[in-house]
Amino acid sequence: MIELFSADGWLNQAIVSVNYFTWTYILVAGLVICALWFTWRTRFVQFRMIGEMVRLLGDSTGTHDEGEKHVSSFQAFAVSIASRVGTGNLAGVATAIAIGGPGAVFWMWVIALLGSATAFIESTLAQLYKRRHADSFIGGPAYYILHGMHCKWMAKLFAVLITMTFCMAYISIQSNTICGAMQKAFSIDPTWMGGALAILSLAIVFGGIQRIAKVSSVLVPMMAVSYVLLALVIIVMNIQLIPHVFRLIVENAFGFEQVAGGGLGATMMNGIKRGLFSNEAGEGSAPNIAATASTTHPVKQGLIQSLGVFTDTLLVCSCTAFIIIISGLYVNNSESGILLTQVALESEVGAAGPIFIAIAIFFFAFSSIIGNYYYGEANVRFLTQKPSAILALRVITGGVMVMFGAIASLDLVWSIGDFFMALITICNLVAILTLGKYAFRLLDDYRQQKRAGVKSPIFKRETMPDIEKDIECWGQ
């Protein structure tokens, strides 16, 4: 059984073959084309309105009935960042550099800069088509596919795929990374670590979205700031190498300096793959939490989630990239993933490096497990309201898949993640390309209100009479 889960097992080899075709011939082109279109059509919203994005983090929740529990704009931002800022930032970046060289970082930056416009579109649509659920809101791609495109089978397909992606594949990756880091730093057996992690995960996921939001809003800023500060210290210590680092990134990005992974193709492919895993722009994940926010206009969450892409890739991912490239250990090194990040940091700060990374990755990846679970729960609730289904999801997510990630090989869990990531992204891109025109109209409405002097724009569904019947919220 363990051999089946190994890097050389037939399961991993089969998935790798499928991933190569899907990513090479479909997904990379689709992501770039969509990102360029949304960037152009929104008139570069991700750059022109970055000041508004930051201001909206302090935006108060929209008006609601007394006793209702709604997620604030900042909490929605924190939960989505909790999912984005995780293994992809420490282990994913290291894997991309190990295979594609420093140039992979350039393509991660590109997909983040352009993809933030895609993130704006999907999260704005999630807010537009959100539904009331108990004392909060619920929504996401499954909901805008059903109520916007009126395509029931596609909505159900997406709900199933994203649940499998985040609650199975991605949580396995987070667990695998935590266990690997803890084994290197503290010699803790992965099986024991997996068991402890499962207990902690179950305790959180049984608490519901309000507990998830509260935990994430505390953990995420703390872990992100501490990691960025350490990276800045290392960069300052090696300030004379920074021009060389940028030169390596640019030269390798365009194939001027070949790498073991196969030159320009491997560099671009791995940069885009790991960039998407990290920032989730266009993947259809962040809209699930964006829909839960109580706000006065759908565009507000679109802008906030766009900022999340910048924060994830341009800040946190870049920190890992600079640490690894400065160390030079990505060249002819047998280590990959989180272990490469650990040895790179060890070369800069000594034996404390692997220990710090082990602790950091625990908080990064554990918060991602929390965020990933919510994405799954939101979509299971779309499929069925049976309490037994939610109970099963919590047990499988917090128990079974955490343990699977602890014992499976690094290559297998990443291959499975890439496979499901491709499927949900293709499905979501089709949806947002179809419905994007409504996000454009919402953005125009928001800008017009701002130009008219309205400090906090308000959206009413009657301003879009052609689709008013499809919108449940946003009434009087």
Enumerate the predicted regions with their spans.
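Extracellular/periplasmic helix-exit of transmembrane alpha-helices
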Residues: F120-Y129, A134, L232-L248, F256, ...
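Helix-loop-helix module between adjacent transmembrane segments
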Residues: C34-T39, I111-D135, P141-N176, G180-V205, ...
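N-terminal alpha-helical transmembrane segments of multi-pass membrane transport
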Residues: M1-T87, A98-G103, L433-Q476
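Alpha-helical membrane segments and immediately flanking helix-loop junctions
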Residues: H64-I97, L125-L128, A134-A142, L146, ...
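Extracellular loop-to-transmembrane helix junctions
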Residues: V16-R55, A98-D135, T311-C319, F419-L429
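Flexible loop linkers connecting adjacent transmembrane helices
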Residues: F44-V71, T95-V105, A117-M149, Y330-E348, ...
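Transmembrane helix-loop junctions in multi-pass membrane proteins
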Residues: W10, R41-Q46, G88-V93, P102, ...
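Membrane-interface loop-to-helix entry segments
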Residues: G30-V54, N176-M182, D189-N238, I242-V250, ...
